[in-house]
Amino acid sequence: MAKHLFTSESVSEGHPDKIADQISDAVLDAILEQDPKARVACETYVKTGMVLVGGEITTSAWVDIEEITRNTVREIGYVHSDMGFDANSCAVLSAIGKQSPDINQGVDRADPLEQGAGDQGLMFGYATNETDVLMPAPITYAHRLVQRQAEVRKNGTLPWLRPDAKSQVTFQYDDGKIVGIDAVVLSTQHSEEIDQKSLQEAVMEEIIKPILPAEWLTSATKFFINPTGRFVIGGPMGDCGLTGRKIIVDTYGGMARHGGGAFSGKDPSKVDRSAAYAARYVAKNIVAAGLADRCEIQVSYAIGVAEPTSIMVETFGTEKVPSEQLTLLVREFFDLRPYGLIQMLDLLHPIYKETAAYGHFGREHFPWEKTDKAQLLRDAAGLK
């Protein structure tokens, strides 16, 4: 592959779909705090003046879903009716059932290690050495832009900003290496009083320049800041939001494949979530060990069965040891059975709400971002 462009996007915590994701994961965290063995599948729908929380939850815990919802919306920043959505006055509806006993009998086992997968499915994990966090650069910097938007909105640097925002970054590659940034898009909701020129200048100086490395920006880099000219109506007033609709933003920005399953609102018995985290952990440790420059892991499951139905390692020709050896190393050093990976990554804790905005991968404090097996893999592979 010679010269090419690659684009990834992200959305802020105030985007309607991300509001829904954060509410679903806030409910999950509140339940796990009381009942780590709970079964949770929590879906959220948001629209002007309304939040609907539904799903299947089996737990001994009691949580106040209305209070959790209002607090989450309040933390995001929707606290006044002039934003079209207000944590203090929106209606909160709840439609929660219990997990089907047919599913439950396939998951629970007397021996925890034999815990079956909560569903069939395929999951991918990915890592690349093109950034310090072993993530693709386009999605990494797209996330950082909208994180910065939230930071300068909340700390009062740009008080006319509102919670809804989107970013998009197009990188230039030459023979697989980054040579620059071709285009940057940043659209942010704002209050009525700010004019377009002032907004564009402030966004450039306070959001874009502090985040994007200067060596990747040239006179040819194109910037599109609120290109429609106005973004006052946003959030759930502009679009309805739904849990699980930003699965590419949540993962690798399109740089790696995706099995199709969303993450937010699901407890770790759901392999859609936990096995995708484990696959990232495996891929990141392989790259951190220097066994490959890029690595994609696929793992698949059958409902009610503990052992994965398949494990695949793809290194795109960048491997330093034979691919067959990599697969054997994965099977030796990583327990990818549902209970095994829950234990390996210590997933039965309320750690999920923070994952629900700005990406599930690439932030070092999450347990699946550890590289604690890199040296073991390197030694076992015989690399000096």
Curated annotation (Swiss-Prot):
| Keywords assigned by UniProt, alphabetized | Acetylation, ATP-binding, Cobalt, Cytoplasm, Host-virus interaction, Magnesium, Manganese, Metal-binding, Nucleotide-binding, One-carbon metabolism, Potassium, Transferase
Question: Known catalysed reaction(s)?
Answer: L-methionine + ATP + H2O = S-adenosyl-L-methionine + phosphate + diphosphate
Q: Which Pfam families match?
A: S-AdoMet_synt_C, S-AdoMet_synt_M, S-AdoMet_synt_N
Look up what happens after changing E43K.
Answer: Misfolding and subject to proteolytic degradation
Recorded phenotype for the gene knockout or disruption: Cells are resistant to methionine-analogs, such as DL-ethionine(Et).
- Mark the residues carrying the PTM N6-acetyllysine: K3
Q: What is its EC number?
A: 2.5.1.6
Q: Which GO terms describe its biological process?
A: one-carbon metabolic process; S-adenosylmethionine biosynthetic process; S-adenosylmethionine cycle
Q: How is the cofactor bound?
A: Binds 2 divalent ions per subunit. The ions interact primarily with the substrate. Binds 1 potassium ion per subunit. The potassium ion interacts primarily with the substrate.
**What top-tier enzyme class does this entry carry?**
transferase
Q: Which residues bind K(+)?
A: E43
In this chain, L-methionine is annotated as bound at E56, Q99, D239, K270
| Reported impact of K246M | Loss of activity. Modification in protein conformation
Q: What is the effect of changing C90 to A/S?
A: Decrease in the homotetramer formation capability. Enhanced thermal stability
Query: Subunit notes for this chain?
Result: Homotetramer; dimer of dimers. The active sites are at the interface between subunits; each dimer has two active sites. (Microbial infection) Interacts with enterobacteria phage T3 S-Adenosylmethionine lyase; this interaction induces the polymerization of METK into filaments that are enzymatically inactive.
Q: What is the protein name stated in its UniProt record? A: S-adenosylmethionine synthase
Organism this protein belongs to: Escherichia coli (strain K12)
Encoding gene, per UniProt annotation: metK
